[in-house]
UniProtKB/Swiss-Prot annotation:
It comes from Dictyostelium discoideum. InterPro entries: Lsm7, Lsm7/SmG-like, LSM_dom_sf, Sm, Sm_dom_euk/arc. Belongs to the snRNP Sm proteins family. Transmembrane segments: none annotated. It is found in: Nucleus. This is Probable U6 snRNA-associated Sm-like protein LSm7. Pfam families: LSM. It comes from the Eukaryota. One of its GO terms (molecular function) is RNA binding. One of its GO terms (biological process) is nuclear-transcribed mRNA catabolic process. Keywords: mRNA processing, mRNA splicing, Nucleus, Ribonucleoprotein, RNA-binding, Spliceosome. Component of the precatalytic spliceosome (spliceosome B complex). Component of the U4/U6-U5 tri-snRNP complex, a building block of the precatalytic spliceosome (spliceosome B complex). LSM2, LSM3, LSM4, LSM5, LSM6, LSM7 and LSM8 form a heptameric, ring-shaped subcomplex (the LSM2-8 complex) that is part of the U4/U6-U5 tri-snRNP complex and the precatalytic spliceosome.
Length: 97
């Protein structure tokens, strides 16, 4: 007996409005990249172009240095994506703790 019920798989994030725009992606493990969103799927696998990685301080991994590394075209695995945010319209604030 087969079931005719096939639920549609929808993305947990609606990134459609950010296609072609610059976004910031943070990963489990602390890495952080910034690039232009070229595509995504329902599992939040993300494709970024003109991607740069922010290098962390060797002595304190919670601190991001001014140093960047150019990566180019990157495919980010959805299971390691912790946060996605637009770079336009956002401004960083100091840690309140």
């Amino acid at each position: 007996m087969t079931s005719s019920f096939n639920p549609k798989k929808e993305s947990i994030l609606d990134l459609q409005k950010f296609l072609g725009k610059e976004i910031c992606v943070k990963f489990t493990g602390g890495r952080e990249v910034q690039g232009i969103l070229k595509g995504y799927d329902q599992l939040v696998n993300i494709t970024l172009d003109q991607t740069q990685e922010f290098i962390r301080d060797a002595e304190d991994p919670l601190i991001t240095t001014d140093e960047k590394r150019f990566l180019g075209l990157v495919v980010c695995r959805g299971s390691s994506v912790m946060m996605v945010c637009p770079t336009e319209g956002c401004e960083p604030i100091d840690n309140p703790y």
